[in-house]
Amino acid sequence: SLSHRFAQNGLAPEFAFKIWSPFLEQLDSHVVEMWKAGQWKDFCGMLPEYASKGHGEGFMHDTAMMLGALGWSEYDGKADIVTPYFGASGTGQINAVFPVTPVTGRDIPKAVASGADGYTPVSRRI
């Protein structure tokens, strides 16, 4: 899942195969191009804001976990797009393969969501 703004009640049939807004569709399109080009440092830097403003499902936790497993901004692979971007109930969807490449793990951020050292904003927990 990319942007995840579901169609409001009563509008679901109209948005069964559409994206909720042109803005989100353009945002997602740019993100897919970043993935295809392997621009992970830039993408990881914008992920918290993308998750918020793009209505990311679960604050893009699935994407964050996948990138953590791949090496975060150190990852140098390029996404192989399996199916073109498509809309489903207002949300942006895609199927892509992210090849595993060797990394050191040096760029993976420390987990802070479970830390008891004090408050941190949600945007810093990814």
Predicted regions and their residues:
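Flexible, D/E/H-enriched segments
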Residues: N9-I126
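Catalytic metal-binding/acid-base residues of hydrolase active sites
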Residues: S3
